[in-house]
Amino acid sequence: MITFPNAKINLGLNIVEKRPDGYHNLETIFYPINLQDALEVTRRENNDKEYTLHISGSPLEGEPEDNLVVQAYKLLKKDYPGLLPVDIHMYKHIPAGAGLGGGSSDAACMIKLLNDKFSLGLSTERMEEYAVKLGADCAFFIRNKPVFATGIGNLFEPVELSLKGYHIILIKPDIFVSTRDAFAEIKPVRPAVSLKEIVKQPMETWKNSMKNDFEDSVFKKFPEIAAIKDELYDLGAVYAAMSGSGSSVYGIFKAPIENVEDKFCGCFCRQRALE
Protein backbone atom coordinates (compact mmCIF):
# COMPACT_ATOMS: atom_id res chain seq x y z
CA MET A 1 0.00 0.00 0.00
CA ILE A 2 1.40 3.36 -1.05
CA THR A 3 0.52 6.97 -0.28
CA PHE A 4 1.95 10.36 -1.18
CA PRO A 5 2.49 12.74 1.77
CA ASN A 6 2.32 16.36 0.65
CA ALA A 7 3.91 19.54 1.92
CA LYS A 8 2.25 22.68 3.30
CA ILE A 9 3.06 26.36 3.31
CA ASN A 10 2.36 28.99 5.95
CA LEU A 11 0.27 31.92 4.80
CA GLY A 12 1.35 34.48 7.36
CA LEU A 13 2.82 33.55 10.74
CA ASN A 14 2.33 35.69 13.83
CA ILE A 15 4.02 34.89 17.14
CA VAL A 16 1.47 36.26 19.59
CA GLU A 17 2.81 35.40 23.06
CA LYS A 18 5.31 33.35 25.03
CA ARG A 19 3.74 30.68 27.20
CA PRO A 20 4.67 29.79 30.80
CA ASP A 21 6.04 26.45 29.53
CA GLY A 22 8.55 28.25 27.30
CA TYR A 23 6.73 27.56 24.04
CA HIS A 24 5.10 30.27 21.94
CA ASN A 25 1.50 30.71 20.90
CA LEU A 26 1.14 31.62 17.27
CA GLU A 27 -1.38 32.06 14.54
CA THR A 28 -0.90 31.02 10.95
CA ILE A 29 -2.74 29.49 8.04
CA PHE A 30 -1.62 26.08 6.83
CA TYR A 31 -2.27 25.45 3.14
CA PRO A 32 -1.50 22.09 1.49
CA ILE A 33 0.54 22.07 -1.71
CA ASN A 34 1.22 19.45 -4.35
CA LEU A 35 4.85 18.70 -3.48
CA GLN A 36 5.02 15.09 -2.37
CA ASP A 37 7.07 12.31 -0.85
CA ALA A 38 6.15 8.67 -1.48
CA LEU A 39 5.50 6.27 1.39
CA GLU A 40 4.93 2.53 0.97
CA VAL A 41 4.26 -0.05 3.66
CA THR A 42 4.34 -3.78 2.98
CA ARG A 43 3.83 -6.75 5.26
CA ARG A 44 7.23 -7.99 6.42
CA GLU A 45 7.63 -11.67 5.58
CA ASN A 46 10.41 -12.21 8.10
CA ASN A 47 9.35 -11.57 11.68
CA ASP A 48 12.88 -11.06 13.01
CA LYS A 49 12.23 -7.27 13.24
CA GLU A 50 9.15 -5.19 13.91
CA TYR A 51 10.02 -2.90 11.03
CA THR A 52 12.64 -1.89 8.49
CA LEU A 53 12.97 1.60 7.03
CA HIS A 54 14.44 2.23 3.58
CA ILE A 55 14.88 5.86 2.52
CA SER A 56 15.76 7.07 -0.97
CA GLY A 57 15.67 10.44 -2.69
CA SER A 58 16.84 13.44 -0.68
CA PRO A 59 19.13 12.37 2.17
CA LEU A 60 17.89 12.54 5.76
CA GLU A 61 20.03 12.89 8.85
CA GLY A 62 19.43 10.91 12.03
CA GLU A 63 18.85 7.32 13.00
CA PRO A 64 15.95 5.31 11.52
CA GLU A 65 14.34 4.78 14.93
CA ASP A 66 14.10 8.56 15.34
CA ASN A 67 12.25 9.05 12.06
CA LEU A 68 8.65 10.15 12.55
CA VAL A 69 7.22 7.37 10.38
CA VAL A 70 8.86 4.84 12.69
CA GLN A 71 7.60 6.77 15.71
CA ALA A 72 4.10 6.64 14.21
CA TYR A 73 4.34 2.86 13.81
CA LYS A 74 5.58 2.43 17.38
CA LEU A 75 2.82 4.70 18.71
CA LEU A 76 0.11 2.58 17.13
CA LYS A 77 1.89 -0.67 18.00
CA LYS A 78 1.70 0.29 21.67
CA ASP A 79 -2.10 0.36 21.54
CA TYR A 80 -2.44 -2.38 18.93
CA PRO A 81 0.10 -5.07 19.88
CA GLY A 82 -1.18 -7.27 17.07
CA LEU A 83 0.07 -4.81 14.46
CA LEU A 84 2.15 -6.92 12.07
CA PRO A 85 5.83 -6.30 11.22
CA VAL A 86 6.30 -4.01 8.21
CA ASP A 87 8.83 -2.89 5.66
CA ILE A 88 8.66 0.87 5.18
CA HIS A 89 9.91 2.42 1.95
CA MET A 90 10.06 6.20 1.77
CA TYR A 91 11.12 8.37 -1.15
CA LYS A 92 11.93 11.88 0.07
CA HIS A 93 11.24 14.75 -2.27
CA ILE A 94 10.08 17.41 0.20
CA PRO A 95 13.28 19.02 1.51
CA ALA A 96 13.95 18.66 5.23
CA GLY A 97 14.38 21.68 7.48
CA ALA A 98 12.48 23.87 5.07
CA GLY A 99 9.35 24.88 7.00
CA LEU A 100 7.23 22.70 4.71
CA GLY A 101 6.13 20.06 7.20
CA GLY A 102 7.54 17.11 5.27
CA GLY A 103 8.35 14.99 8.31
CA SER A 104 5.01 15.75 9.93
CA SER A 105 3.17 14.86 6.73
CA ASP A 106 5.05 11.56 6.46
CA ALA A 107 4.06 10.69 10.04
CA ALA A 108 0.39 11.59 9.56
CA CYS A 109 0.20 9.61 6.35
CA MET A 110 1.84 6.66 8.09
CA ILE A 111 -0.98 6.69 10.66
CA LYS A 112 -3.61 6.83 7.91
CA LEU A 113 -1.87 4.13 5.90
CA LEU A 114 -1.56 1.73 8.85
CA ASN A 115 -5.19 2.38 9.75
CA ASP A 116 -6.28 1.40 6.23
CA LYS A 117 -3.87 -1.47 5.67
CA PHE A 118 -4.59 -3.23 8.95
CA SER A 119 -8.25 -2.17 9.29
CA LEU A 120 -7.74 -0.57 12.70
CA GLY A 121 -11.01 1.33 12.47
CA LEU A 122 -9.59 4.62 13.73
CA SER A 123 -11.81 7.67 13.28
CA THR A 124 -10.41 10.88 11.83
CA GLU A 125 -10.51 12.43 15.30
CA ARG A 126 -8.63 9.49 16.82
CA MET A 127 -5.96 9.66 14.14
CA GLU A 128 -5.56 13.36 14.91
CA GLU A 129 -5.06 12.52 18.58
CA TYR A 130 -2.25 10.14 17.67
CA ALA A 131 -0.72 12.59 15.19
CA VAL A 132 -0.47 15.50 17.62
CA LYS A 133 1.66 13.31 19.89
CA LEU A 134 4.28 13.22 17.14
CA GLY A 135 4.39 16.94 16.37
CA ALA A 136 2.33 20.09 16.72
CA ASP A 137 1.44 20.31 13.03
CA CYS A 138 1.17 16.56 12.35
CA ALA A 139 -2.58 16.49 12.92
CA PHE A 140 -3.10 19.05 10.14
CA PHE A 141 -2.15 16.45 7.55
CA ILE A 142 -4.83 14.00 8.69
CA ARG A 143 -7.58 16.11 7.08
CA ASN A 144 -5.14 17.99 4.85
CA LYS A 145 -7.35 21.01 4.24
CA PRO A 146 -6.64 24.73 4.80
CA VAL A 147 -6.87 25.73 8.46
CA PHE A 148 -6.30 28.68 10.73
CA ALA A 149 -3.84 27.27 13.28
CA THR A 150 -3.35 28.62 16.79
CA GLY A 151 -1.81 27.42 20.05
CA ILE A 152 1.64 26.04 19.25
CA GLY A 153 0.34 25.20 15.79
CA ASN A 154 -1.82 22.34 17.05
CA LEU A 155 -5.30 23.91 17.27
CA PHE A 156 -7.15 24.10 13.97
CA GLU A 157 -10.14 25.97 12.63
CA PRO A 158 -11.21 25.34 9.02
CA VAL A 159 -10.96 28.31 6.66
CA GLU A 160 -12.74 28.79 3.37
CA LEU A 161 -9.77 29.43 1.12
CA SER A 162 -8.98 28.20 -2.38
CA LEU A 163 -5.90 29.17 -4.38
CA LYS A 164 -6.94 27.00 -7.34
CA GLY A 165 -5.82 28.59 -10.59
CA TYR A 166 -2.66 30.08 -9.08
CA HIS A 167 0.84 28.64 -9.38
CA ILE A 168 3.49 28.39 -6.69
CA ILE A 169 7.25 28.55 -7.06
CA LEU A 170 9.07 27.08 -4.10
CA ILE A 171 12.75 27.82 -3.44
CA LYS A 172 14.89 26.18 -0.76
CA PRO A 173 18.49 27.42 -0.55
CA ASP A 174 21.20 25.23 0.94
CA ILE A 175 20.89 27.03 4.28
CA PHE A 176 19.90 25.61 7.66
CA VAL A 177 17.83 27.89 9.89
CA SER A 178 17.68 26.93 13.55
CA THR A 179 14.06 27.12 14.69
CA ARG A 180 15.25 27.57 18.27
CA ASP A 181 17.40 30.56 17.29
CA ALA A 182 14.60 32.00 15.17
CA PHE A 183 12.20 31.91 18.12
CA ALA A 184 14.84 33.45 20.40
CA GLU A 185 14.89 36.59 18.25
CA ILE A 186 11.12 37.06 18.30
CA LYS A 187 9.30 39.67 20.37
CA PRO A 188 5.71 38.40 20.48
CA VAL A 189 3.02 40.86 19.42
CA ARG A 190 -0.67 40.15 18.99
CA PRO A 191 -1.66 41.39 15.52
CA ALA A 192 -4.27 44.09 15.13
CA VAL A 193 -6.02 42.10 12.38
CA SER A 194 -6.36 38.33 12.36
CA LEU A 195 -5.01 36.32 9.45
CA LYS A 196 -8.52 34.88 9.10
CA GLU A 197 -9.66 38.33 8.01
CA ILE A 198 -6.61 39.15 5.89
CA VAL A 199 -6.98 36.08 3.65
CA LYS A 200 -10.52 37.14 2.80
CA GLN A 201 -9.08 40.19 1.05
CA PRO A 202 -7.72 40.15 -2.53
CA MET A 203 -4.30 38.51 -2.73
CA GLU A 204 -2.87 41.72 -4.14
CA THR A 205 -3.29 43.25 -0.67
CA TRP A 206 -1.47 40.46 1.18
CA LYS A 207 2.00 41.85 0.51
CA ASN A 208 1.35 44.80 2.82
CA SER A 209 -0.84 43.08 5.40
CA MET A 210 0.26 39.45 5.83
CA LYS A 211 3.65 38.87 7.44
CA ASN A 212 5.79 36.01 8.68
CA ASP A 213 7.28 37.24 11.97
CA PHE A 214 10.37 35.06 11.50
CA GLU A 215 11.44 36.96 8.40
CA ASP A 216 12.95 39.97 10.18
CA SER A 217 15.51 38.00 12.17
CA VAL A 218 16.12 35.28 9.57
CA PHE A 219 16.59 37.77 6.73
CA LYS A 220 18.99 39.78 8.88
CA LYS A 221 21.14 36.71 9.49
CA PHE A 222 20.74 35.27 5.99
CA PRO A 223 20.29 38.11 3.47
CA GLU A 224 20.45 35.58 0.64
CA ILE A 225 17.05 34.25 1.78
CA ALA A 226 15.65 37.78 1.67
CA ALA A 227 17.09 38.12 -1.84
CA ILE A 228 15.08 35.07 -2.96
CA LYS A 229 11.86 36.70 -1.80
CA ASP A 230 12.77 39.90 -3.65
CA GLU A 231 13.56 37.93 -6.81
CA LEU A 232 10.17 36.19 -6.68
CA TYR A 233 8.45 39.56 -6.53
CA ASP A 234 10.62 40.75 -9.42
CA LEU A 235 9.40 37.74 -11.41
CA GLY A 236 5.82 38.86 -10.85
CA ALA A 237 4.65 37.08 -7.72
CA VAL A 238 1.35 38.34 -6.36
CA TYR A 239 2.51 37.29 -2.90
CA ALA A 240 5.79 35.88 -1.59
CA ALA A 241 6.92 34.84 1.88
CA MET A 242 9.07 32.48 3.87
CA SER A 243 7.33 29.32 5.04
CA GLY A 244 7.57 28.53 8.75
CA SER A 245 10.97 29.47 10.14
CA GLY A 246 12.57 28.78 6.76
CA SER A 247 14.62 28.35 4.91
CA SER A 248 12.18 27.84 2.03
CA VAL A 249 10.55 30.81 0.34
CA TYR A 250 7.57 30.66 -1.99
CA GLY A 251 5.95 32.94 -4.50
CA ILE A 252 2.35 32.72 -5.72
CA PHE A 253 1.83 33.61 -9.38
CA LYS A 254 -1.12 33.99 -11.71
CA ALA A 255 0.63 31.96 -14.43
CA PRO A 256 3.60 29.57 -14.70
CA ILE A 257 7.07 31.09 -15.10
CA GLU A 258 9.31 29.63 -17.78
CA ASN A 259 12.87 28.46 -17.04
CA VAL A 260 12.55 29.42 -13.39
CA GLU A 261 15.21 26.88 -12.36
CA ASP A 262 17.82 28.91 -14.23
CA LYS A 263 17.15 31.89 -11.98
CA PHE A 264 17.82 30.01 -8.73
CA CYS A 265 20.92 27.94 -9.44
CA GLY A 266 22.14 25.90 -6.48
CA CYS A 267 18.71 25.91 -4.82
CA PHE A 268 15.92 23.37 -4.61
CA CYS A 269 13.38 24.83 -7.03
CA ARG A 270 9.94 23.49 -7.89
CA GLN A 271 6.88 24.94 -9.58
CA ARG A 272 3.40 23.55 -9.02
CA ALA A 273 -0.22 24.39 -9.76
CA LEU A 274 -2.17 25.14 -6.59
CA GLU A 275 -5.42 23.36 -5.82
Swiss-Prot record:
Transmembrane segments: none annotated. The keyword Nucleotide-binding applies. One of its GO terms (biological process) is terpenoid biosynthetic process. Pathway: Isoprenoid biosynthesis; isopentenyl diphosphate biosynthesis via DXP pathway; isopentenyl diphosphate from 1-deoxy-D-xylulose 5-phosphate: step 3/6. GO terms for molecular function: 4-(cytidine 5'-diphospho)-2-C-methyl-D-erythritol kinase activity; ATP binding. InterPro entries: GHMP_kinase_C_dom, GHMP_kinase_C_sf, GHMP_kinase_N_dom, IspE, Ribosomal_Su5_D2-typ_SF, Ribsml_uS5_D2-typ_fold_subgr. It catalyses: 4-CDP-2-C-methyl-D-erythritol + ATP = 4-CDP-2-C-methyl-D-erythritol 2-phosphate + ADP + H(+). It comes from the Bacteria. The active site is at 8, 137. ATP binds at residues 95-105. Keywords: ATP-binding, Isoprene biosynthesis, Kinase, Nucleotide-binding, Transferase. SUPFAM superfamilies: GHMP Kinase, C-terminal domain, Ribosomal protein S5 domain 2-like. Its EC number is 2.7.1.148. Disulfide bonds: none annotated. It holds the Pfam family GHMP_kinases_N. Belongs to the GHMP kinase family. IspE subfamily. Catalyzes the phosphorylation of the position 2 hydroxy group of 4-diphosphocytidyl-2C-methyl-D-erythritol. NCBIfam families: ispE. This is 4-diphosphocytidyl-2-C-methyl-D-erythritol kinase.
